[in-house]
Amino acid sequence: MTTTDRAGLGRQLQMIRGLHWGYGSNGDPYPMLLCGHDDDPQRRYRSMRESGVRRSRTETWVVADHATARQVLDDPAFTRATGRTPEWMRAAGAPPAEWAQPFRDVHAASWEGEVPDVGELAESFAGLLPGAGARLDLVGDFAWQVPVQGMTAVLGAAGVLRGAAWDARVSLDAQLSPQQLAVTEAAVAALPADPALRALFAGAEMTANTVVDAVLAVSAEPGLAERIADDPAAAQRTVAEVLRLHPALHLERRTATAEVRLGEHVIGEGEEVVVVVAAANRDPEVFAEPDRLDVDRPDADRALSAHRGHPGRLEELVTALATAALRAAAKALPGLTPSGPVVRRRRSPVLRGTNRCPVEL
Protein backbone atom coordinates (compact mmCIF):
# COMPACT_ATOMS: atom_id res chain seq x y z
CA MET A 1 0.00 0.00 0.00
CA THR A 2 1.60 3.26 -1.10
CA THR A 3 -0.50 5.61 1.02
CA THR A 4 1.13 6.17 4.39
CA ASP A 5 -0.92 9.17 5.46
CA ARG A 6 -3.89 8.02 7.56
CA ALA A 7 -6.02 10.97 6.51
CA GLY A 8 -5.29 10.29 2.85
CA LEU A 9 -6.12 6.61 3.14
CA GLY A 10 -9.30 7.38 5.07
CA ARG A 11 -10.37 9.83 2.39
CA GLN A 12 -9.80 7.27 -0.35
CA LEU A 13 -11.78 4.56 1.44
CA GLN A 14 -14.63 6.98 2.09
CA MET A 15 -14.56 8.30 -1.49
CA ILE A 16 -14.79 4.85 -3.10
CA ARG A 17 -17.53 3.75 -0.73
CA GLY A 18 -19.48 6.93 -1.38
CA LEU A 19 -19.23 6.47 -5.14
CA HIS A 20 -20.33 2.84 -4.83
CA TRP A 21 -23.35 4.04 -2.90
CA GLY A 22 -24.08 6.77 -5.43
CA TYR A 23 -23.88 4.43 -8.43
CA GLY A 24 -25.97 1.83 -6.62
CA SER A 25 -28.63 4.32 -5.56
CA ASN A 26 -29.06 5.21 -9.22
CA GLY A 27 -29.97 1.68 -10.23
CA ASP A 28 -26.68 -0.19 -10.65
CA PRO A 29 -26.98 -3.42 -8.60
CA TYR A 30 -23.28 -4.34 -8.54
CA PRO A 31 -21.89 -1.34 -6.60
CA MET A 32 -24.88 -1.55 -4.27
CA LEU A 33 -23.94 -5.18 -3.64
CA LEU A 34 -20.38 -4.04 -2.85
CA CYS A 35 -21.72 -1.77 -0.10
CA GLY A 36 -22.54 -4.98 1.79
CA HIS A 37 -25.78 -3.94 3.46
CA ASP A 38 -28.02 -6.80 2.28
CA ASP A 39 -29.15 -9.26 4.95
CA ASP A 40 -30.11 -11.57 2.09
CA PRO A 41 -28.61 -10.73 -1.33
CA GLN A 42 -30.53 -13.44 -3.22
CA ARG A 43 -33.04 -10.99 -4.73
CA ARG A 44 -30.18 -8.92 -6.09
CA TYR A 45 -28.42 -12.08 -7.32
CA ARG A 46 -31.52 -13.15 -9.26
CA SER A 47 -31.79 -9.75 -10.93
CA MET A 48 -28.13 -9.82 -11.95
CA ARG A 49 -28.41 -13.38 -13.27
CA GLU A 50 -31.39 -12.44 -15.43
CA SER A 51 -29.60 -9.37 -16.83
CA GLY A 52 -26.93 -11.34 -18.70
CA VAL A 53 -23.40 -10.01 -19.18
CA ARG A 54 -23.53 -6.40 -18.06
CA ARG A 55 -21.04 -3.59 -17.66
CA SER A 56 -21.45 -1.77 -14.38
CA ARG A 57 -20.87 1.97 -14.02
CA THR A 58 -17.82 0.93 -12.01
CA GLU A 59 -16.37 -0.25 -15.38
CA THR A 60 -16.51 -3.86 -14.14
CA TRP A 61 -18.19 -6.51 -16.27
CA VAL A 62 -20.60 -8.56 -14.16
CA VAL A 63 -21.48 -12.19 -14.94
CA ALA A 64 -24.09 -14.10 -12.93
CA ASP A 65 -25.52 -16.89 -15.13
CA HIS A 66 -23.99 -20.35 -14.87
CA ALA A 67 -22.88 -20.81 -18.49
CA THR A 68 -20.98 -17.52 -18.76
CA ALA A 69 -19.62 -17.82 -15.23
CA ARG A 70 -18.16 -21.20 -16.11
CA GLN A 71 -16.68 -19.77 -19.30
CA VAL A 72 -14.85 -17.04 -17.37
CA LEU A 73 -13.61 -19.35 -14.61
CA ASP A 74 -12.37 -21.96 -17.10
CA ASP A 75 -10.65 -19.53 -19.47
CA PRO A 76 -6.93 -19.12 -18.62
CA ALA A 77 -7.10 -15.64 -20.16
CA PHE A 78 -8.94 -14.55 -16.99
CA THR A 79 -6.68 -14.46 -13.93
CA ARG A 80 -6.60 -12.91 -10.46
CA ALA A 81 -4.03 -10.35 -11.58
CA THR A 82 -4.73 -6.66 -11.01
CA GLY A 83 -6.02 -4.94 -14.13
CA ARG A 84 -6.08 -1.34 -15.26
CA THR A 85 -7.33 1.41 -12.98
CA PRO A 86 -10.89 2.51 -13.84
CA GLU A 87 -11.12 6.14 -14.93
CA TRP A 88 -13.57 7.05 -12.18
CA MET A 89 -11.15 5.80 -9.51
CA ARG A 90 -8.31 7.71 -11.13
CA ALA A 91 -10.42 10.87 -11.24
CA ALA A 92 -11.34 10.39 -7.58
CA GLY A 93 -7.67 10.13 -6.63
CA ALA A 94 -8.19 6.65 -5.21
CA PRO A 95 -6.56 4.02 -7.44
CA PRO A 96 -6.74 0.44 -6.06
CA ALA A 97 -2.95 0.38 -5.68
CA GLU A 98 -3.35 2.80 -2.77
CA TRP A 99 -6.18 1.14 -0.82
CA ALA A 100 -6.81 -2.38 -2.14
CA GLN A 101 -3.55 -3.87 -3.45
CA PRO A 102 -2.46 -5.78 -0.31
CA PHE A 103 -5.84 -7.48 -0.30
CA ARG A 104 -5.72 -8.21 -4.02
CA ASP A 105 -2.36 -9.86 -3.37
CA VAL A 106 -4.09 -12.11 -0.81
CA HIS A 107 -6.71 -13.02 -3.40
CA ALA A 108 -4.03 -13.83 -5.97
CA ALA A 109 -1.97 -15.96 -3.58
CA SER A 110 -2.09 -19.75 -3.66
CA TRP A 111 -1.27 -22.59 -1.28
CA GLU A 112 0.24 -25.84 -2.55
CA GLY A 113 0.65 -27.80 0.69
CA GLU A 114 -0.55 -31.22 1.82
CA VAL A 115 -4.21 -31.51 2.81
CA PRO A 116 -4.59 -33.38 6.15
CA ASP A 117 -6.68 -36.57 6.33
CA VAL A 118 -10.36 -35.78 7.00
CA GLY A 119 -10.78 -38.70 9.41
CA GLU A 120 -7.80 -37.64 11.50
CA LEU A 121 -9.03 -34.05 11.50
CA ALA A 122 -12.48 -35.15 12.66
CA GLU A 123 -10.94 -37.01 15.60
CA SER A 124 -8.92 -33.95 16.57
CA PHE A 125 -12.05 -31.75 16.47
CA ALA A 126 -14.07 -34.09 18.70
CA GLY A 127 -13.64 -31.99 21.84
CA LEU A 128 -14.28 -28.56 20.32
CA LEU A 129 -18.03 -28.53 21.06
CA PRO A 130 -19.10 -28.45 24.73
CA GLY A 131 -21.69 -30.82 26.19
CA ALA A 132 -25.48 -30.63 26.18
CA GLY A 133 -26.99 -27.55 27.79
CA ALA A 134 -24.09 -25.27 26.91
CA ARG A 135 -24.54 -21.90 25.28
CA LEU A 136 -21.92 -20.70 22.84
CA ASP A 137 -21.12 -18.45 19.94
CA LEU A 138 -20.90 -20.82 17.00
CA VAL A 139 -18.43 -18.48 15.27
CA GLY A 140 -15.83 -17.79 17.95
CA ASP A 141 -16.25 -20.90 20.09
CA PHE A 142 -16.37 -23.51 17.34
CA ALA A 143 -16.15 -22.42 13.69
CA TRP A 144 -12.99 -20.32 14.09
CA GLN A 145 -11.35 -22.98 16.24
CA VAL A 146 -11.59 -25.40 13.30
CA PRO A 147 -9.04 -23.60 11.07
CA VAL A 148 -6.93 -22.57 14.06
CA GLN A 149 -6.57 -26.19 15.15
CA GLY A 150 -6.73 -27.79 11.72
CA MET A 151 -4.13 -25.56 10.13
CA THR A 152 -1.74 -26.13 13.01
CA ALA A 153 -0.88 -29.39 11.25
CA VAL A 154 0.05 -27.31 8.22
CA LEU A 155 1.79 -24.40 9.96
CA GLY A 156 2.92 -25.90 13.23
CA ALA A 157 2.00 -22.64 14.97
CA ALA A 158 -1.62 -22.10 15.98
CA GLY A 159 -0.79 -18.75 17.57
CA VAL A 160 -0.17 -17.22 14.15
CA LEU A 161 -3.76 -17.91 13.13
CA ARG A 162 -5.32 -17.11 16.47
CA GLY A 163 -4.44 -13.45 16.39
CA ALA A 164 -3.33 -12.18 13.02
CA ALA A 165 -5.72 -14.20 10.85
CA TRP A 166 -8.69 -12.81 12.77
CA ASP A 167 -7.56 -9.24 12.05
CA ALA A 168 -6.94 -10.12 8.40
CA ARG A 169 -10.27 -11.88 7.91
CA VAL A 170 -11.69 -8.94 5.91
CA SER A 171 -8.98 -9.21 3.22
CA LEU A 172 -11.02 -10.84 0.46
CA ASP A 173 -13.85 -8.37 1.02
CA ALA A 174 -11.46 -5.41 1.17
CA GLN A 175 -10.10 -6.09 -2.33
CA LEU A 176 -13.49 -4.89 -3.68
CA SER A 177 -15.34 -3.20 -0.83
CA PRO A 178 -13.56 -0.46 1.18
CA GLN A 179 -13.53 -1.19 4.90
CA GLN A 180 -13.38 1.27 7.77
CA LEU A 181 -9.99 2.89 8.24
CA ALA A 182 -9.10 1.17 11.53
CA VAL A 183 -10.19 -2.21 10.15
CA THR A 184 -8.11 -1.66 7.00
CA GLU A 185 -5.01 -0.70 8.97
CA ALA A 186 -5.33 -3.68 11.31
CA ALA A 187 -5.77 -6.06 8.38
CA VAL A 188 -2.74 -4.72 6.49
CA ALA A 189 -0.61 -4.93 9.64
CA ALA A 190 -1.68 -8.54 10.21
CA LEU A 191 -0.87 -9.82 6.72
CA PRO A 192 2.27 -11.99 6.51
CA ALA A 193 4.87 -11.51 3.79
CA ASP A 194 4.74 -15.15 2.65
CA PRO A 195 2.11 -15.52 -0.13
CA ALA A 196 1.28 -19.11 0.88
CA LEU A 197 0.62 -17.99 4.45
CA ARG A 198 -1.55 -15.16 3.14
CA ALA A 199 -3.61 -17.73 1.28
CA LEU A 200 -4.01 -19.74 4.48
CA PHE A 201 -5.16 -16.63 6.33
CA ALA A 202 -7.87 -16.19 3.70
CA GLY A 203 -8.70 -19.88 4.00
CA ALA A 204 -9.26 -19.54 7.74
CA GLU A 205 -12.17 -17.13 7.29
CA MET A 206 -13.53 -19.17 4.37
CA THR A 207 -13.46 -22.28 6.55
CA ALA A 208 -15.14 -20.64 9.53
CA ASN A 209 -17.97 -19.26 7.39
CA THR A 210 -18.48 -22.61 5.69
CA VAL A 211 -18.63 -24.40 9.06
CA VAL A 212 -21.27 -21.96 10.34
CA ASP A 213 -23.36 -22.30 7.17
CA ALA A 214 -23.05 -26.10 7.23
CA VAL A 215 -23.97 -26.46 10.91
CA LEU A 216 -27.01 -24.20 10.53
CA ALA A 217 -28.12 -26.05 7.39
CA VAL A 218 -27.78 -29.48 8.97
CA SER A 219 -29.51 -28.52 12.21
CA ALA A 220 -32.45 -27.20 10.19
CA GLU A 221 -32.80 -30.38 8.09
CA PRO A 222 -34.60 -33.19 9.99
CA GLY A 223 -32.63 -36.42 10.13
CA LEU A 224 -29.54 -35.10 8.33
CA ALA A 225 -27.33 -34.89 11.43
CA GLU A 226 -28.12 -38.50 12.35
CA ARG A 227 -27.35 -39.55 8.80
CA ILE A 228 -23.95 -37.83 8.91
CA ALA A 229 -23.18 -39.47 12.26
CA ASP A 230 -23.92 -42.90 10.73
CA ASP A 231 -22.37 -42.28 7.31
CA PRO A 232 -19.22 -40.11 7.20
CA ALA A 233 -19.50 -39.86 3.40
CA ALA A 234 -22.71 -37.88 3.86
CA ALA A 235 -20.70 -35.09 5.49
CA GLN A 236 -18.70 -34.53 2.31
CA ARG A 237 -21.86 -34.39 0.17
CA THR A 238 -23.45 -32.01 2.65
CA VAL A 239 -20.50 -29.62 2.59
CA ALA A 240 -20.51 -29.69 -1.21
CA GLU A 241 -24.20 -28.79 -1.29
CA VAL A 242 -23.77 -26.06 1.33
CA LEU A 243 -20.93 -24.60 -0.76
CA ARG A 244 -23.22 -24.59 -3.79
CA LEU A 245 -25.84 -22.60 -1.88
CA HIS A 246 -23.36 -20.51 0.11
CA PRO A 247 -20.02 -20.42 -1.75
CA ALA A 248 -16.88 -19.66 0.22
CA LEU A 249 -16.53 -16.65 -2.11
CA HIS A 250 -19.81 -15.22 -3.40
CA LEU A 251 -17.98 -12.91 -5.82
CA GLU A 252 -14.86 -13.75 -7.82
CA ARG A 253 -12.79 -11.01 -9.45
CA ARG A 254 -10.86 -11.88 -12.61
CA THR A 255 -8.88 -9.72 -15.04
CA ALA A 256 -8.74 -10.30 -18.79
CA THR A 257 -5.11 -10.77 -19.86
CA ALA A 258 -6.18 -10.71 -23.51
CA GLU A 259 -9.21 -9.61 -25.49
CA VAL A 260 -12.04 -12.12 -24.91
CA ARG A 261 -15.60 -12.31 -26.20
CA LEU A 262 -18.40 -13.05 -23.71
CA GLY A 263 -21.66 -13.43 -25.58
CA GLU A 264 -22.24 -10.22 -27.53
CA HIS A 265 -19.57 -8.30 -25.62
CA VAL A 266 -15.83 -8.00 -26.12
CA ILE A 267 -13.85 -7.74 -22.89
CA GLY A 268 -10.68 -5.72 -23.41
CA GLU A 269 -7.27 -6.65 -22.07
CA GLY A 270 -6.89 -5.36 -18.51
CA GLU A 271 -10.63 -5.07 -17.91
CA GLU A 272 -12.13 -6.54 -14.76
CA VAL A 273 -14.85 -9.21 -14.70
CA VAL A 274 -16.67 -10.21 -11.52
CA VAL A 275 -18.39 -13.59 -11.45
CA VAL A 276 -21.32 -13.76 -9.03
CA VAL A 277 -20.70 -17.39 -8.09
CA ALA A 278 -23.56 -17.44 -5.58
CA ALA A 279 -26.00 -16.47 -8.34
CA ALA A 280 -24.61 -18.91 -10.91
CA ASN A 281 -24.93 -21.81 -8.46
CA ARG A 282 -28.67 -21.19 -8.17
CA ASP A 283 -29.30 -20.89 -11.89
CA PRO A 284 -32.64 -22.65 -12.56
CA GLU A 285 -31.43 -23.45 -16.09
CA VAL A 286 -28.89 -25.80 -14.51
CA PHE A 287 -30.16 -26.91 -11.09
CA ALA A 288 -33.57 -28.37 -10.25
CA GLU A 289 -35.09 -26.57 -7.25
CA PRO A 290 -31.92 -24.48 -6.99
CA ASP A 291 -32.75 -22.89 -3.62
CA ARG A 292 -33.31 -26.22 -1.85
CA LEU A 293 -30.65 -28.08 0.16
CA ASP A 294 -30.38 -31.56 -1.39
CA VAL A 295 -27.34 -33.57 -0.33
CA ASP A 296 -28.20 -36.26 -2.88
CA ARG A 297 -28.49 -33.80 -5.75
CA PRO A 298 -27.67 -35.60 -9.04
CA ASP A 299 -26.34 -32.41 -10.61
CA ALA A 300 -24.04 -31.55 -7.69
CA ASP A 301 -20.91 -31.77 -9.84
CA ARG A 302 -22.09 -28.75 -11.85
CA ALA A 303 -21.64 -26.38 -8.91
CA LEU A 304 -19.00 -23.72 -9.50
CA SER A 305 -16.26 -22.53 -7.17
CA ALA A 306 -14.48 -19.18 -7.19
CA HIS A 307 -11.19 -21.13 -7.07
CA ARG A 308 -11.92 -22.89 -10.34
CA GLY A 309 -9.04 -22.21 -12.72
CA HIS A 310 -6.82 -20.78 -9.97
CA PRO A 311 -3.75 -22.82 -8.95
CA GLY A 312 -3.29 -24.35 -5.53
CA ARG A 313 -5.11 -26.59 -3.05
CA LEU A 314 -6.73 -24.04 -0.74
CA GLU A 315 -10.24 -25.07 -1.76
CA GLU A 316 -9.43 -28.71 -0.94
CA LEU A 317 -8.16 -27.66 2.48
CA VAL A 318 -11.25 -25.58 3.27
CA THR A 319 -13.53 -28.42 2.20
CA ALA A 320 -11.58 -30.98 4.24
CA LEU A 321 -11.66 -28.84 7.38
CA ALA A 322 -15.39 -28.13 7.07
CA THR A 323 -16.18 -31.78 6.36
CA ALA A 324 -14.17 -32.92 9.37
CA ALA A 325 -15.88 -30.34 11.59
CA LEU A 326 -19.30 -31.55 10.48
CA ARG A 327 -18.39 -35.16 11.19
CA ALA A 328 -17.06 -34.24 14.62
CA ALA A 329 -20.18 -32.23 15.51
CA ALA A 330 -22.82 -34.50 13.96
CA LYS A 331 -23.95 -36.22 17.17
CA ALA A 332 -24.49 -32.88 18.92
CA LEU A 333 -26.34 -31.16 16.08
CA PRO A 334 -29.84 -32.64 16.64
CA GLY A 335 -29.96 -30.74 19.93
CA LEU A 336 -28.61 -27.46 18.56
CA THR A 337 -31.03 -24.52 18.59
CA PRO A 338 -30.46 -20.82 17.86
CA SER A 339 -30.46 -18.62 20.96
CA GLY A 340 -30.22 -15.31 19.10
CA PRO A 341 -29.96 -13.84 15.59
CA VAL A 342 -27.13 -14.63 13.20
CA VAL A 343 -25.07 -11.44 12.86
CA ARG A 344 -23.48 -11.08 9.42
CA ARG A 345 -20.52 -8.81 8.94
CA ARG A 346 -21.32 -5.63 7.03
CA ARG A 347 -19.14 -4.64 4.07
CA SER A 348 -18.70 -8.35 3.33
CA PRO A 349 -20.04 -8.89 -0.21
CA VAL A 350 -17.37 -11.46 -1.11
CA LEU A 351 -17.33 -13.69 1.96
CA ARG A 352 -20.72 -12.93 3.52
CA GLY A 353 -18.81 -13.27 6.78
CA THR A 354 -20.50 -14.17 10.05
CA ASN A 355 -19.57 -12.18 13.16
CA ARG A 356 -21.72 -13.94 15.72
CA CYS A 357 -24.12 -16.89 15.88
CA PRO A 358 -25.44 -17.66 19.40
CA VAL A 359 -26.69 -21.23 19.84
CA GLU A 360 -27.58 -23.66 22.61
CA LEU A 361 -26.87 -27.39 22.68
UniProtKB/Swiss-Prot annotation:
Q: Does the keyword Lyase apply?
A: no
One biological process term from GO is: antibiotic biosynthetic process
What exactly does this protein do? Involved in the erythromycin biosynthesis pathway. Acts by forming a complex and stabilizing the desosaminyl transferase EryCIII.
Any single GO molecular-function term of the entry would be: iron ion binding
Pathway assignment: Antibiotic biosynthesis; erythromycin biosynthesis
**This protein is called what?**
Cytochrome P450 family protein EryCII
The primary gene name is eryCII
Q: Which Pfam families match?
A: p450 (PF00067)
Instruction: Indicate whether Nucleotidyltransferase appears among the record's keywords.
Output: no
Describe the subunit structure. Heterotetramer composed of EryCII and EryCIII.
